[in-house]
């Protein structure tokens, strides 16, 4: 039976260029969508620009244009970049749309009627010059822990500590430079804590389509930490409102109050799909009504799991809609082992890649060849990129057609021999279900390894049968025709297998093969006595100069990525040189982790219950991003500063020491290992 599927990628924010980090997700999604369509399923792929919020408003003001004009321009740029990489959206829309406004307000009203919205008076920092309340990231100051300057209002990028904006020393507005004031304001909260029972059931449940989990195992473990165990929950209610001035949608019956961008952003999935449905005549309600039998999948980055696996399903369910079938998260992209960061400009833009004339299918293949169903970071190693593309796509795949097509054209009038009984083709066809399952399960790396293994088998067949020698031998025309026909059929099968990853090459190959289009059926079927067209070269090799030119075009961002500690070093120089006596004041001890857990209300902190041998202590550490499953640290030995002055960690409690960790090249913090035999309380030094 034909499946009905809605698929989305996370919405790019309308405040900058698309970089290759974005492309990881959109390539991952596009490959899956193209596979579904090749299989004959009704699959709709929708996305949009995420256009609301203070950053967009301020960026437009800085440019001296209306926010509406700025986001329209950015959307055109984003769509051009994605289209250049053959991302085949059925609709690429904007969250600043009439559909999104209507859906956002309807969902809010439904949640309010369901008792899930509550108003509260809160205190916030206010910019007296700009007459606006300041989001955390628009307050800067001195870190209260390490005293690094110019740190954001929610966490320190030097030492990793999280805090509230009011804890900053000498805070100032990043908008005007003014000293902010603490003022009261009425805000609206989505009572997420009351949704815990539903969320515990949904996050740990399986979808009715095929019985697979709604979430990946790593994501489920993280949700369990946030949701708590048993009847208790650690979920905090969610502030869904912002004060004017703000670029977004005004909350019904609340003048001067606007929906926080993270409320209307996921609703943008609905809006984009509704816009598509109205254009092509699809029943929108069939996909979003409660109890819908259709499928809905969201492909996202691991950094926005909290919103998509908790807020979004709860918003949908308690407003009378269906919840997602699956939420699939991926890791981040690094370049030559270094972290990419949009906020710091350390990224290779999609536009620069295209402008340098590099084939986008090279990057599609390379990224797909590293993706699997787990939440793992992937690295773009530029030398490996060159060698893998040249070896796999040019050396193994397209050369098959190049080596056989000339003989078919010159010796057999462009017509193939019927080779339905070929053992080689039977071998390729036998892998159809396995490779289909790998695509379905997002195990692209495994699928492409298997496809390249088949390509190796075809090339071994070429070398064993040597069509160039058969062409020179008397009485071998029949055998030459047979061998070359097998090779063209094998090339067709490989093209069908690769079509989700290489859509443009597949389309060009279809023209050469004289086929209307490549479908998944081509992985099993032979072409018979089929006439083909003259072969045109399908793919060039990657040249070192092309990659060198790409690096040159992005040299400032690449240089920043290659020296991530440069900015931090200025803070290190502030400290005076330590003497031996100074060092001896630091009492470092071995401690055993009795229990480690996530901290409610913080995406940075982990809470450690530690046994120092002589006593037990609680220490908070800002390493949550490095350990998605904190429970795996239970029983581990760590090194901690035992005489570090206790420090109050905002609303989370008192930290009674400091755990030592190492900052890796990709920006993560990793706990230091303790050699076997060390016991809790042992002194380090």
Curated annotation (Swiss-Prot):
Reactions listed under catalytic activity: tRNA(Met) + L-methionine + ATP = L-methionyl-tRNA(Met) + AMP + diphosphate
GO molecular function, one term: methionine-tRNA ligase activity
Organism of origin: Neisseria meningitidis serogroup C (strain 053442)
Protein name stated in the entry: Methionine--tRNA ligase
Subcellular location: Cytoplasm
Cofactor requirement: Zn(2+)
Span of the annotated motif 'HIGH' region: 12-22
Positions that bind Zn(2+): 143, 146, 156, 159
EC supergroup of this enzyme: ligase
Subunit organization: Homodimer.
One cellular component (GO) term of this entry: cytosol
Enzyme Commission number, as recorded: 6.1.1.10
Keyword Aminoacyl-tRNA synthetase carried by entry: yes
Annotated cofactor note: Binds 1 zinc ion per subunit.
Residue positions of motif 'KMSKS' region: 339-343
Chain ranges of the tRNA-binding domain: 582-685
Protein family membership: Belongs to the class-I aminoacyl-tRNA synthetase family. MetG type 1 subfamily.
HAMAP family recorded: Met_tRNA_synth_type1 (MF_00098)
Annotated Pfam families: Anticodon_3 (PF19303), tRNA-synt_1g (PF09334), tRNA_bind (PF01588)
Superkingdom field: Bacteria
Gene name for this UniProt entry: metG
